[in-house]
């Protein structure tokens, strides 16, 4: 493709791109009958540039942490999701406030810039402050937004936050993002949005992800039933957006597997912002009733703790022994259900987790004489109760006995988990799942491309068990947690 384009006059024009795509689809259909796969491969090739044959190829990131007992003391990693949710709530009602201690990573900056594109007034300072300066509300029936192009970066949560904010106002806009969002599956969103008086269509025929066009009437219902296939991040963004609706709304979460996990995070945030919200949770019903309003925040808004990153650091002693201490309050995660899930998981494993005032600490294998082997944690045979964001961590921890014994029982996983992804993760550790049993195989030497930051963090823990695992996209972690690899490479202290 690259060679053809360089030989063509006016190289790169849309006509030539169309000719290439049409030719590709005609010829590729001879080897595959899956039109979706053919289009996805072509979209991937769009990202590839011709390179000289002698050009040095980038090497994968070698994961080889020190396998010694840990003695780590650090501040707890700050959350980037809670500040983004607060930025959106403040923008929804044009609330003036200052967020303190915010990690200025890629997703936070992309969210800030995206909100500014639709009328918010946000600016950031190098010390981690984000100043929400009022301006015009970005939600509401009287705030139409027409013929606008909005860039949302590379994070799906930012995309969903923006989508559901724009659904609250008459809108006709184009949403674009980085390459990672070209392949996000927006089909569940497209099927759901008509219930909210909106429509999302793909700009590229047959491509599921961005770029996409959103049209919204802002004619919002008073009752919404959430479908089971709606992504968990999209559900969270929807609940956040209800604060800016024009009428009271009841969101029925009964049919969604992650409903309780998500509402346990969002409800306290809405209530702390002065939004009237009440939960109905019975055996047959799970629903959230929200009375829209303008968010009001206290003066000192701290970012809270990133529960997945904190749990990853606290899990390290289970692999090599020692202790990890993080300064911070566990309640500051703003996610009580995930916090309880971490406590329950560590308790099953036999990892000592202490949540004292102002400090989180985890230890394992203390008291073992020098030279004695570290025992394996207790086996965990069921991971179905874990929130989806914690599943990769739970899997890595549960595999410790099987890796050391070169086999064992595969823990039970949620039905929705990507089984191909799980199998490729197992292969990196020299395991394969056959009829519910873990069997030993030759470890894969192919560099692993992680689909999410959570899976990349889990792989970094797996390297304690099998050093020199190769991660082809370490930037997926750096984008969210810029200092993680520095910490990782300086262990055991």
What name fits each language-model region?
Residues 1-493:
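Short, structured segments at the rim of ligand-binding sites
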């Amino acid at each position: 493709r690259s060679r053809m384009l360089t030989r063509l006059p006016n190289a790169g024009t849309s006509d030539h791109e169309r000719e290439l795509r049409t030719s590709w689809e005609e010829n590729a259909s001879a080897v595959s009958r899956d039109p979706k796969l053919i289009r996805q491969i072509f979209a991937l090739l769009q990202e590839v540039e011709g390179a000289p044959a002698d050009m040095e190829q980038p090497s994968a990131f070698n994961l080889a942490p020190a396998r010694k007992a840990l003695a780590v003391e650090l501040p707890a990693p700050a959350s980037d999701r809670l500040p983004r949710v607060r930025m959106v709530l403040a923008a929804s009602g044009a609330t003036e406030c200052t967020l303190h201690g915010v990690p200025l990573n890629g997703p936070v900056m992309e969210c800030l810039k995206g909100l500014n594109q639709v009328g918010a007034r946000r600016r950031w300072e190098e010390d981690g402050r984000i100043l929400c300066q009022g301006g015009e509300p970005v939600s509401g029936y009287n705030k139409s937004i027409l013929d606008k192009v909005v860039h949302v970066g590379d994070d799906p949560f930012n995309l969903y936050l923006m989508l559901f904010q724009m659904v609250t106002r008459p809108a006709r806009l184009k949403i674009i993002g980085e390459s990672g969002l070209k392949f996000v599956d927006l089909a569940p969103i497209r099927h759901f949005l008509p219930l909210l008086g909106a429509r999302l269509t793909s700009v590229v025929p047959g491509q599921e992800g961005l770029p996409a066009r959103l049209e919204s009437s802002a004619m919002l219902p008073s009752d919404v039933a959430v479908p089971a296939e709606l992504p968990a991040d999209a559900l969270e963004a929807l609940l956040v957006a209800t604060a800016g609706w024009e009428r009271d709304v009841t969101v029925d979460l009964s049919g969604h597997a992650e409903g309780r996990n998500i509402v346990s995070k969002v409800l306290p945030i809405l209530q702390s912002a002065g939004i009237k919200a009440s939960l109905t949770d019975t055996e047959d019903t799970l629903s959230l009733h929200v009375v829209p309003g303008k968010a009001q925040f206290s003066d000192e808004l701290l970012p809270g703790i990133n529960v997945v990153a904190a749990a990853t650091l606290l899990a390290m002693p289970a692999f090599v022994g020692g202790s990890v201490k993080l300064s911070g309050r566990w309640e500051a995660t703003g996610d009580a259900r995930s916090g309880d899930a971490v406590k329950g998981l560590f308790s099953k494993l036999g990892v000592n987790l202490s949540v004292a005032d102002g400090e989180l600490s985890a230890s394992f294998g203390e008291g073992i004489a020098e030279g004695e082997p570290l025992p394996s944690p207790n086996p965990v045979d069921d991971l179905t109760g874990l929130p989806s964001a914690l599943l990769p961590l739970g899997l890595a921890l549960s595999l410790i006995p099987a890796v050391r014994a070169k086999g064992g029982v595969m823990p039970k996983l949620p039905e929705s988990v990507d089984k191909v992804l799980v199998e490729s993760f197992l292969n990196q550790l020299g395991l394969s799942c056959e009829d519910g049993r873990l069997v030993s195989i030759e470890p894969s030497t192919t560099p692993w491309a992680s689909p999410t930051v959570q899976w990349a963090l889990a792989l970094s823990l797996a390297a304690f068990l099998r050093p020199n695992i190769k991660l082809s996209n370490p930037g997926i972690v750096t984008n969210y947690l810029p200092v993680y690899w520095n910490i990782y490479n300086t262990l055991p202290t």
